[in-house]
Regions:
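Interhelical loop/hinge segments that connect adjacent transmembrane helices in multipass membrane
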Residues: 1-18, 125-126, 186-194, 199-241
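Interfacial/gating helices of multi-pass transporter permease domains
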Residues: 12, 16, 35-59, 122-126, ...
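Residue-level signature of transmembrane alpha-helical cores of multipass secondary-active transporters
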Residues: 16-24, 59, 134, 160, ...
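Small-residue-rich hydrophobic transmembrane alpha-helices
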Residues: 48-100, 144-153, 261-311
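Short runs within selected transmembrane alpha-helices of multi-pass transporters and secretion channels
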Residues: 66-73, 133-152, 163-168, 189-205, ...
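Short membrane-interface helical motifs at transmembrane helix boundaries
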Residues: 98-128, 309-327
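Alpha-helical transmembrane segments of multi-pass membrane proteins
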Residues: 121-147, 270, 274, 327
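Membrane-interface helix-loop junctions in multi-pass transport and translocation proteins
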Residues: 168-201, 316-327
Length: 327
């Protein structure tokens, strides 16, 4: 067994998976929560629709680097490996932030939001502003990658969980406090999402320092090798991010498109956390490879986890669950 690697057991796998699970849930569930801040603004639910579409484009762009965390979990286990991973993360961040800024410019913004998604000019502007100022959020996600990889590789589940819980709690506090002080609308909604992510990144950096100092020297793959490893891992996240955009292009042409899109994104707020959580099983498979030919213990763990995750959308499809979702 590789030095420093934890042997597989259901408890070890669950302990490793829970921070990934919590992060996936927080990354998706916090967005519907912030809908309360946005929809209480002057444009009501229409602003929530435009805001959500701006976020969808952001996630599509970010998904092009969706495999970075897993790449770091494979290659960033030595000082030199972490250094190469940090450079790769920085390069991909710079390129994708530039792409995000470019998409906000004319004529791309009008083509995407006006032509493809069928938004009127006012809602197109809200979506464009959301996408543009989400560059800060996107940068925070990338900056978080490096310390999160260090924590995951060190099996520091407590610290990783603490960072994510702090993000959820701060988001919840904003959702309650902002409307009380009249701080509503898309711009304040974006603040309510972005500031907690920055907090999560800063806490991750703080907790990761002691584990980074413990890394040993050793060989490392080049940036290009790590990039080639990242691309196929990003494919699943990319498909997951593209599907809401494709669906929105059809929903936006239905009767009462703004209302229909708002319902669409509330529903995605339930489905997406489950999908992202299931996708994180890739990281568990990387961290706990088979220890002998025919070792299927992780397969059984994945099946049980998948069944438990599937219960969540099922419960919301029941009459009582529908009432809760509507409320």
């Amino acid at each position: 067994m590789e030095s420093g690697r934890v042997a597989y057991s259901p408890k070890a796998a669950a302990r490793f998976y829970v921070p990934l699970l919590l992060q996936a849930f927080s990354q998706s569930l916090t967005y519907p929560l912030v809908g309360a801040v946005i929809s209480h603004g002057p444009d009501g639910v229409n602003a929530l629709t435009a805001f959500s579409l701006g976020q969808v484009i952001q996630f599509m762009i970010g998904a092009l680097a969706g495999g970075l965390i897993m790449t770091g979990m494979v290659f960033a286990k030595t000082r030199s490996g972490l250094s190469s991973f940090r450079r790769l993360n920085g390069v991909m961040m710079a390129v994708l932030l530039a792409v995000q800024a470019l998409v906000c410019m004319h004529p791309f913004d009008t083509f995407i939001f006006g032509h493809l998604l069928n938004l009127n000019p006012h809602l197109t502007e809200i979506a464009r502003r959301t996408l543009f100022f989400s560059i800060v959020m996107q940068a925070a996600f990338f900056m978080r990658n490096v310390p999160q990889v260090i924590l995951f590789n060190a099996y520091a589940s407590f610290e990783a969980n603490l960072c994510t819980v702090a993000r959820i709690l701060l988001t919840g506090a904003f959702v309650v406090a902002f409307p009380m002080f009249g701080m509503v609308g898309p711009d304040w909604g974006l603040v309510a999402l972005t500031a907690p992510i920055i907090l999560e990144w800063l806490l991750s950096e703080l907790f990761a320092r002691k584990y980074e100092r413990r890394l040993e020297d050793g060989g490392s793959a080049s940036i290009m090798e790590q990039f080639r490893f990242t691309v196929p891992l990003s494919f699943g996240a990319g498909l997951l991010a593209v599907s809401p955009f494709m669906t929105a292009a059809f929903v936006g042409r239905a009767a009462n498109p703004a209302d229909m899109l708002a319902i669409h994104y509330v529903t995605l707020g339930i489905a997406n956390p489950v999908a992202y959580a299931a996708l994180r099983m890739q990281a568990v498979a990387i961290q706990f490879p088979p220890e002998w030919t025919g070792d299927r213990r992780l397969l059984r763990f994945a099946v049980v986890a998948g069944l438990l995750l599937g219960v969540i959308p099922f419960l919301f499809s029941l009459p009582r669950g529908k009432e809760l979702e509507n409320n």
